[in-house]
A protein has these predicted regions:
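Conserved AMP-binding A3 loop
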Residues: 29-34, 168-192
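Conserved S/T- and glycine-rich ATP-binding loop of Class I adenylate-forming
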Residues: 58, 75, 106, 167, ...
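Conserved AMP-binding/adenylate-forming
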Residues: 26-31, 45-92, 213-214
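Conserved pre-ATP/AMP-binding loop-to-beta segment of ANL
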Residues: 14-17, 133, 139, 149-172, ...
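Structural core segment of the AMP-binding/adenylate-forming
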Residues: 49, 73, 77-147
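Conserved AMP-binding/adenylation subdomain of ANL enzymes
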Residues: 191-211, 215-248
Length: 248
């Protein structure tokens, strides 16, 4: 997906809109597929510099931050396994997930109490090596925004690049009746959601689609990433915490 769709669209239509993002402070950002190609390459190179390699597990707790899309596609290019997670998790949730999946690194929002919960959980999570903060700073954490931007915007496909049956991502189930279970998906997974986007969401080429979901939920990947971009449409992302009737 990262090479065959994102990079290919960037080559074919460099100025094609991929995402319209509105932050909590109402800052508007427009990202083309060329932007996604370049920023995801920076991410792939950055993760590689940290010793993250094909098959390693990386958790993403990034709410609706635009950096999620950069990191997600970067991990796809590198072949590391992305594990999206919600910022509603607390210490014991993180500890269980870190150890069950063998998480090597986490990218975490600086918002709220989430990074503190990760710090507590990390004391009992021997596989976790890198804690990377996004949209802020924290003692003992790497600064994603400062560090990844120093890397090259070029990341080439190789004979060992991920594809087909290689693992793309992992979700944890809700754990309603027991401990959450891992649901793993391979690199064919995005193709299945072309139908989701085209026939359920009615996405169109050059259209703009809104899915409210936080990136920690499975809905975000089939509602605001894979299927929509396969339809060659853009996604609209509003990085909010709570909808207020008084705000416009």
């Amino acid at each position: 997906f990262a090479f065959d769709l994102v990079d290919a669209l960037a080559e074919r239509e460099p100025d094609k809109l991929a995402m319209l993002h509105i932050s909590k402070d109402k800052t508007e950002r427009r990202f083309t597929f060329t932007d996604i190609k370049k920023e995801s390459a920076r991410c792939a190179n950055y993760f590689k510099s940290l010793g993250i390699k094909k098959g390693d597990r990386v958790m993403l707790v990034l709410k609706r931050h635009y950096q999620f899309w950069f990191a997600m596609i970067g991990l796809n290019k590198l072949g590391a396994v992305a594990i999206p997670a919600t910022n509603q998790l607390v210490e014991h949730d993180f500890e269980y997930r870190f150890n069950a999946a063998g998480v090597k690194a986490i990218l975490c929002t600086a918002d709220g109490d989430t990074a503190h919960q990760v710090d507590i959980a990390s004391k009992n999570s021997p596989t976790l090596i890198h804690k990377i903060i996004v949209n802020g700073t924290r003692e003992g954490w790497r600064n994603f925004d400062e560090e990844y931007s120093l890397f090259s915007t070029h990341f080439k496909r190789t004979a060992d690049s991920p594809c087909g049956d290689d693992t793309l991502l992992m979700f944890f189930t809700s754990g309603t009746t027991g401990y959450p279970k891992i649901a793993a998906h391979n690199h064919k997974y995005p193709l299945g959601h072309f139908h989701t986007a085209k026939y359920w969401h009615c996405c169109e080429r050059d259209g703009l689609h809104l899915t409210i979901s936080d990136t920690g939920w499975g809905k975000s990947l089939w509602g605001k990433l894979y299927g929509q971009w396969l339809c060659e449409g853009a996604v609209f992302v509003y990085d909010f915490d709570k909808i207020s009737k008084s705000k416009k």
